[in-house]
Amino acid sequence: MEDNITSIVIDCGSGMCKAGIGGEEFPRVSFPSIVGKPRFEKTMCAIGNKEYYVGDEAQSQRGMLSLKYPIKNGIVVNWEYMEKLLFHMFYNELRVSPDQYPILFTESPLNPKSNREMLTQIMFEKFNVPALYIAIQAVLSLYASGRTCGIVLDSGDDVTHTVPIYGGYVLQHSIIRLNFAGSDLTEYMAKLLLERGYSFTTTSEMEIVKSIKEKLAYVAINFNAEMSKPIDTLETTYQLPDGQIIIIGNERFRCAEALFQPSMIGLECDGIHETIFKSIMMCDIDIRKHMYANILLSGGNTMLSGISDRIYNQLRELAPNNMKILIVASPERKNLVWIGGSILTTLPLFQEMWISKEEYDEHGPSIINKKVGLY
């Protein structure tokens, strides 16, 4: 690979793993965070005699594999499979030798210290990296927008967080986590389409539903007003991979409405607007105005059309009358965490934050907890 690589930035979420070169604009690779093992020995022969498959390859062979998701709700739950995912990412996707470059990893807010230490141990002992840093995803999103204060609504595949940050520091006591995100909307869309007579049940069919959601779903500015519109004004068509054309109507915004009314899918939790409001109210009274004026959307699940206007309207009803509210919705918010990490690795002040192999050898995995959180 090129000689001008200074560092590698890795953002692994529950749904997708993104990786690339520090200082570049976008991640070079992105693949599903899944690992598959052949169900039977005969299957191994049929699909190439591999012990396991990762990412897109696992997705394409899923009928013959037992699929595992190493990351659940933003937290690594299976380290054996996480190692396989990382090996695949370095050697098959990025095609780099990890012992040559410092590695910046992103992590979910509220990630247990023990998990952080385990990742540190794996990176130094299994992959022999020369240096490592682990940064909190929401902070990186904020950096990518040129801010050090604000509240980040980060919603990906299966977890949503509201994370207040002030002066670059995460306000841990004000974080709220919802185990509810994009995959829940995909399942709800499948249920709504079933009511229309279209059945999607298999893993591959659910990928089609995900594509329908990403292309056609939107957030209604006013849900009741949208529901009262004539049906034919809402309907559009979608061509399935087999050529069949289906009609989709109010499912497009009913699906996304679950973000604001989780009870629609049977969840007893607050909507995203209420979660933002509660997170802000848990902050010190003197900094709440900074939070309201810097509400940053991050993650693939915030890419829905109309979401920022709807959040603004809902918060306008909850916030004090004279409060300035600003929703920041970057067109790149799907990759905002990775972009923030890429920016961070280029800052001169950050270079002293890397944890070196020498430091690790001297202090062990706990060294990571002494430095993480400063950026």
Curated annotation (Swiss-Prot):
GO terms for cellular component: actin cytoskeleton; cytoplasm. Its EC number is 3.6.4.-. Keywords: ATP-binding, Cytoplasm, Cytoskeleton, Hydrolase, Nucleotide-binding. It catalyses: ATP + H2O = ADP + phosphate + H(+). One of its GO terms (biological process) is phagocytosis. Pfam families: Actin (PF00022). The keyword Hydrolase applies. It is an enzyme of class 3 (hydrolase). Belongs to the actin family. This is Putative actin-26.
